[in-house]
């Protein structure tokens, strides 16, 4: 309960302050970076994950109901499947008819049968504006080897299924189950004395897993594969590809160790 104290300028009421008093709420972009990092970390530490298959999604184009803003919109798409987040490039001046033709390769974890897609208008001096979204169930016909080329209705400020439509082409590829995961090497600290520099740390083993012999030294000249860079880029869409390449090379091409290092860089930034 507030109390009253008299001063030279008048009465002042003193009471309990709210918990969020003088606190700055994180922006939408900061929250998104934290969510992406948590999603990537949960995927990295999930241990054994027997995947069902690989889903190829081609985001072709969209027909939107309205151009929001004073100028032509610069739309891009964001797809969430399981714990993974993927983004298309920005269709500059795409307005109501953006075209992307972006192919996204997604790994489908067990129990996941749908994905969520959003369309944002990229802004230069303010937060990106979410203009449309929809929830899509993965068609069962894909597992029969068929391709799906369909238009899906979008929801937004105009109402459910009234914000336009988006054209997606999907295909499915079966992949063998993954082998049991090896002990994960965790990097507690990353010193950014130079891009891609990561200190050597002792391996930390997951509880309940047998101790394994230390792996042989990795040749520092290990060739970095482009598909590994693209796979990590899909997990960190805002990360510079050259930074990903440098970290991957510093880890001798070890994709899991590179993801660990990038997660630490995101948390420390």
From Swiss-Prot:
Pfam family, one: C2
GO terms of molecular function: ubiquitin binding; ubiquitin conjugating enzyme binding
GO BP terms, alphabetized: autophagy; inflammatory response; innate immune response; phosphorylation; ubiquitin-dependent protein catabolic process
Motif AIM1 positions after renumbering to this chain: 133-136
Compartments, record wording: Cytoplasm
Lineage: superkingdom: Eukaryota
Domain named C2: residues: 35-152
Keywords (A to Z) from UniProt: Autophagy, Cytoplasm, Immunity, Inflammatory response, Innate immunity, Repeat
Family matches, as PROSITE patterns: C2 (PS50004), CUE (PS51140)
Matches recorded under SUPFAM superfamilies: C2 domain (Calcium/lipid-binding domain, CaLB) (SSF49562), UBA-like (SSF46934)
Sequence motif AIM2, location on chain: 151-154
Domain CUE: 224-267
InterPro entries on file: C2_dom, C2_domain_sf, CUE, TOLIP_CUE, Tollip_C2, UBA-like_sf
Keyword Transit peptide: no
GO CC annotations on file: cytoplasm
Family: Belongs to the tollip family.
Function in brief: Component of the signaling pathway of IL-1 and Toll-like receptors. Inhibits cell activation by microbial products. Connects the ubiquitin pathway to autophagy by functioning as a ubiquitin-ATG8 family adapter and thus mediating autophagic clearance of ubiquitin conjugates. The TOLLIP-dependent selective autophagy pathway plays an important role in clearance.
Subunit-level organization: Interacts with ATG8 family proteins (via AIM motifs), and ubiquitin (via CUE domain). of cytotoxic polyQ proteins aggregates.
Annotated domain remarks: Both ATG8-interaction motifs (AIM1 and AIM2) are required for the association with ATG8 family proteins.
Name by which UniProt lists this protein: Toll-interacting protein B
Source species of the chain: Xenopus laevis
Gene transcribed to yield this protein: tollip-b
